[in-house]
Regions:
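Active-site acidic catalytic loop and adjacent metal/ATP-binding pocket
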Residues: 27-29, 67, 178-227
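ATP-dependent phospho-/nucleotidyl transfer catalytic cores
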Residues: 18, 38-45, 96, 124-194
């Protein structure tokens, strides 16, 4: 009896010689190079949009992963349990090290290059873009909910005690962020594009060609490119004790490829929101 990845792979016009279990995916040696079989939780139309967007990025000079079609020209294949997968090119490389300022700079430049390309890709006029200030408000509500949960407990541990002491400061930061983001969104000065959606040290690699390359675009969505940059900075800063020199290096590297105006810089305030 076939294993689940083998059932999904037989839907494609290719010969597979070896399958290796990777991080949440299957690395496949095939007659046309290495492929990655990845579980997919979206619908077919979203997968088609992702495939078209990745093709656009590649045509515009960034050799990102491309998604394969099945024998029936579908994007999604299913295994014997009806779980969905997509098959894409495997871009081998070394992940960004959060201990290396050069790596973090390289990842930041790659993100800026990606954003330069994506801003040329037109979004449908009726597409929904997640509101930044509403997201900030939800995070504030979560902080209040957590505080109320701690208050109801008869005993608290050291972490919960520390959280309660810092609660007001974090909540005020979140409220200030939501207020500023609301003003920016109302001014219509932020321009939405497609965003990577999960740009961190695991999703940008240094390839054999000597270039940094974003990978794993499954969470790509319409939004504001500044959110990618802010989340990347947050991840790097968390790993480096919130060293402001790291933030400066990441911003400088990004801006060396893609400039940020005052509005874009101000929108990065949501990095201060509690997570």
């Amino acid at each position: 009896m076939y294993n689940q990845p083998e059932v999904a792979l037989e839907k494609y016009e290719l010969t597979v010689s070896r399958i290796i279990k990777g991080r949440g995916a299957y690395i496949c040696d095939t007659g046309i190079g290495q492929k990655l079989l990845v579980p997919y939780r979206g619908h077919e139309q979203r997968a088609c949009t992702l495939r078209d967007t990745l093709a656009f990025i590649q045509r515009n000079g960034m050799d990102v992963e491309q998604i394969s079609q099945t024998k029936e020209q579908c994007i999604i294949s299913r295994d014997n349990c009806e779980d969905a997968y997509i098959l894409k090119d495997y871009r081998a490389g070394r992940e960004c090290s959060t201990d290396s300022i050069d790596d973090m700079r390289g990842g930041s430049r790659a993100l800026a290059q990606l954003h330069n390309i994506l801003e040329k890709y037109p979004l449908p006029s009726d597409i929904d873009v997640e509101s930044l200030h509403e997201k900030a408000q939800r995070k504030c509500a979560q902080i209040v909910k957590l505080k109320n949960y701690i208050l109801r407990r008869s005993k608290t541990n050291a972490f919960e005690h520390l959280f309660y002491e810092c609660y007001e400061r974090f909540l005020e930061q979140g409220k200030k962020s939501a207020e500023i983001l609301c003003e920016l969104e109302n001014s219509k000065t932020l321009v939405p594009t497609y965003c990577h959606g999960a740009f961190n040290q695991h999703n940008v690699v240094y390839t054999q060609s000597g270039r940094w390359l974003p990978v794993n675009f499954e969470t790509m969505h319409p939004g504001y490119p500044e959110t990618d940059l802010a989340e990347y900075m947050r991840k790097m800063l968390e790993k480096n004790h919130w060293d402001t020199a790291v933030a400066d290096a990441i911003l400088d590297s990004y801006c060396s490829v893609r400039s940020l105006d005052d509005t874009s810089m101000l929108s990065l305030i949501h990095i201060s929101e509690p997570t």
